[in-house]
Amino acid sequence: GKVRSDIPAILTVGAEYSVIPSVRVAAGFHYYWDKDAKGSAIKEGSNTWEAILGAEWDINSKWLVSAGVQRTQYGFADADISDLNYNINSTALCIGGAYKFNNRMKLNVGYMHSFYGEHNVAGAAAGMNDIYTRKNDAVGVSFDIRF
């Protein structure tokens, strides 16, 4: 069958500031009203939020480097966690770079590693706990072409 998991509302704010023309810093915040979603797995917990901070530096007209961090805090209570549905609070660290071939073509690369916490939940067997955790690494490559 179908499972609804709509988010009734999301608040997103962000800002970027150029410290000097070649250095930019940015911050963002997201708040999800996912606890109140129809079909939501969150029954007893709270809503989810994320905070993001990043920076970019144009080393010269060809090269750019970037770094960032994102903290995600899920609102799951123990009763909301199961083998079929779990999200774990995390902090992601990201690094990236870009090479600009000319005004029309740019190669972008990035790497992200997420550090997840553990969530211990009383297991079905008496005296046993289920421990939920995960690992995540991601690599991204893209090529921008401006027409």
Annotate each predicted stretch with a short phrase.
Residues 1-147:
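Outer-membrane beta-barrel porins/channels
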